[in-house]
Amino acid sequence: MQNELQTALFQAFDTLNLQRVKTFSVPPVTLCGPGSVSSCGQQAQTRGLKHLFVMADSFLHQAGMTAGLTRSLTVKGIAMTLWPCPVGEPCITDVCAAVAQLRESGCDGVIAFGGGSVLDAAKAVTLLVTNPDSTLAEMSETSVLQPRLPLIAIPTTAGTGSETTNVTVIIDAVSGRKQVLAHASLMPDVAILDAALTEGVPSHVTAMTGIDALTHAIEAYSALNATPFTDSLAIGAIAMIGKSLPKAVGYGHDLAARESMLLASCMAGMAFSSAGLGLCHAMAHQPGAALHIPHGLANAMLLPTVMEFNRMVCRERFSQIGRALRTKKSDDRDAINAVSELIAEVGIGKRLGDVGATSAHYGAWAQAALEDICLRSNPRTASLEQIVGLYAAAQ
């Protein structure tokens, strides 16, 4: 009897310990530096790939931006089938169309070349094509799935960090909501960070994607699942963004600033992929899907308000964020002010009312935010009424 009791106690302790275990994972290979896109063919060849399905931003392809990628594949004798991705955030109908084309072409791997929307779509495609009996809506982070197709991710904006995360966000065609799926299989095999590909990104897009990266870093640093690994990446990314984003927005051909932003975006992605995000993302997904506004802009409109809500449980962490942004002694309020000032400096200091949001939206949006997986790692619990109030405060 005593042995049974002892075993039960140890099992209980083991269960409690497992609940405290935190993970940290990054892609196996990350290449960076101007011109690094030329390494894509070698990376594909190393993995034994013969025919790649290239999902590329349609505008970038038309502008000739995929030429270097094409050359690197041709030199290695690797065939490619091009799939121009539609403009805007990925919808499940577009993803399913790409899956059908990939199956028909017989490709053995995928390259994603574009912004976060293209990368998210490609991640979903690689998973769905090898799991034909499952839908994204049915999948969860604990789903047992067949291995996805090999994936090489080449971001052309500095923001989502999708090239280094285990997350994809796809708009459901029926509900209009954003489906957020986190799964270990969604982590790309290779991330190629070539800052030269980001030089032509318009200033307003640079600003929005940059604030998205800042939001990733701040939420990862504040998250319940933060670890020393993710803390180092997140606070480093915050400092880099504070220094480099105004330069990248103001002078797009500043390659050093562009590269710094691309690295910061990647670091923030690594951080939140393990630590999680928070209430700002849970809330931002709703107006983004309903009003079709860019994700980075939605984050910019909500981040200071959500930080004020979380401040009571994040005082020391916010003080460190303030120091990272202002390079001087700061308190928690200074951090929120510094974030607001940076958002205004890069020209996207808008309110929800400016993009068509009204109080009639807030109840449904708040309910959807409560169901968003990003909320799980927020440092402070939020009720439906509190989230409605936060939307109203950002009006």
From Swiss-Prot:
PROSITE patterns, alphabetized: ADH_IRON_1, ADH_IRON_2
Main location, first listed in the record: other
GO cellular component: bacterial microcompartment
Catalytic activity: ethanol + NAD(+) = acetaldehyde + NADH + H(+)
BP GO annotations: ethanolamine catabolic process
E.C. numbers: 1.1.1.1
Domain of life: Bacteria
Keywords, ordered alphabetically: Bacterial microcompartment, Iron, Metal-binding, NAD, Oxidoreductase
Metabolic or biological pathway, per its Swiss-Prot or TrEMBL entry: Amine and polyamine degradation; ethanolamine degradation
Protein name (Swiss-Prot/TrEMBL): Probable alcohol dehydrogenase EutG
